[in-house]
From Swiss-Prot:
GO MF entry, a single one: DNA binding
Family per similarity comment: Belongs to the transposase IS1111A/IS1328/IS1533 family.
Protein name: Transposase for insertion sequence element IS1328
Keyword Metal-binding on entry: no
InterPro entries on file: Transp_IS110-like_N (IPR002525), Transpos_IS110 (IPR047650), Transposase_20 (IPR003346)
GO biological process, one term: DNA transposition
Protein keywords: DNA recombination, DNA-binding, Transposable element, Transposition
Function: Required for the transposition of the insertion element.
Length: 334
């Protein structure tokens, strides 16, 4: 097909549905392929734009198709949905991807590298292990409370668990259960520490992450995740765009010429947003030891707004600073 200029692909686990268009938007081909057949088809096509939704497997396919000489564009599924016509099927989805791609104002997702995907997987596994560790601690608290034993909040139950059977009469099966939970807690701690060591080792060889560590309040985990999400930062036109992508800006609902700002939009990566807010709170807790324009700005905001509002505003500012540090290759300066 020498006239094809745009190919929309609806990705699947084993099957791929394509919709091919020429420069005027007329349909040239609709066909279903397997993974191998799709590669063979794209290898014989002239260089063109290949568009896909940024879903599972999209970043790998983007890298693979780019090696075949095509220009790959990834679109967030939420921007494709308005272009779906009538009933939904795989071919209509592929056509909707083509329609969305042809819009001049459409926002696209930059394909991730293999290293970025691997680091993102490490962060997701660590986050899951941390949640599992909290769950194990809460279970031990709850089981002891059912037998009238109230323990302090946090990991104190772990430190005092060995003395609990000696101080209180408990059924043998409960003691064995608590022992298993304690062992599981220790296993989770070991896994989390191992992943954090891998992140620190990778961080030592990443120049961008090292520059991000110069930002006050930013630690190892946050710097690693920021470096993974930002890449070279060129996917965002400005620091304002990156701040908005983290969901740390007010949600707008305006009509009739009246502008209404609501709570933060909470878009994007929830884990990154949570870490940035934690970094902001750490900075605010040690505000008396901070100096420079950022500290003066935070002090001024605290005189006018609640500390929770200031924490979100500071988290947004830290995200914008991270974009500048990444794109300009500089370090943070007070």
């Amino acid at each position: 097909m020498p006239n094809v200029t745009l190919i929309g692909i609806d990705l699947g686990k084993n099957s791929f549905h394509i919709h091919c268009q020429e420069k005027h938007g007329n349909t040239l081909l609709r066909k279903r392929f397997s993974r191998i057949q799709l590669t063979q088809f794209l290898a014989t096509c002239p260089p063109c734009i290949v568009a896909m939704e940024s879903c599972a497997g999209a970043h790998f396919m983007a890298r693979h198709i780019s090696q075949l000489g095509h220009q790959v564009k990834l679109i967030s599924p939420q921007f494709v949905r308005p272009f779906v016509k009538s009933n939904k099927n795989d071919f209509i989805d592929a056509e909707a991807i083509c329609e969305a791609t042809s819009r001049p104002s459409m926002h696209f997702v930059t394909p991730r590298t293999e290293d970025q995907q691997a680091m993102s997987a490490l962060h997701r596994v660590r986050d899951a292990l941390v949640r599992e560790r909290v769950k194990a601690t809460n279970q031990m608290h709850a089981f002891l409370l059912e037998f009238g034993i109230s323990m302090p909040r946090g990991i104190a139950v772990i430190k005092r668990l060995a003395t609990v059977p000696e101080e209180h009469e408990l059924p043998p099966y409960l003691v064995r259960l608590l022992t298993r939970l304690h062992q599981h807690y220790g296993y989770l701690c070991e896994q989390i520490e191992e992943i954090e060591r891998e992140l620190k080792n990778h961080l030592a060889d990443d120049e961008t992450a090292q520059r991000l560590l110069t930002i006050p309040g930013i630690g190892t985990i946050t710097a690693s995740l920021l470096a993974t999400k930002l890449g070279d930062g060129k996917n965002y036109l400005s620091s304002r765009d990156f701040g908005a992508s983290t969901g740390l800006v007010p949600r707008q609902y305006s009509t009739g010429g009246k502008s209404t700002l609501m709570g933060i939009s909470k878009r994007g990566d929830k884990n990154l947003r949570r870490l940035l807010v934690q970094c902001a709170r750490v900075y605010m807790q040690r505000l008396e030891y901070q100096s420079g324009r950022l500290a003066e700005w935070v002090n001024g905001q605290l005189t006018r707004h609640h500390s929770n509002v200031v924490a979100c505003a500071l988290a947004n500012k830290l995200a914008r600073i991270a974009w500048v540090v990444t794109t300009q290759g500089t370090v943070f300066s007070k």
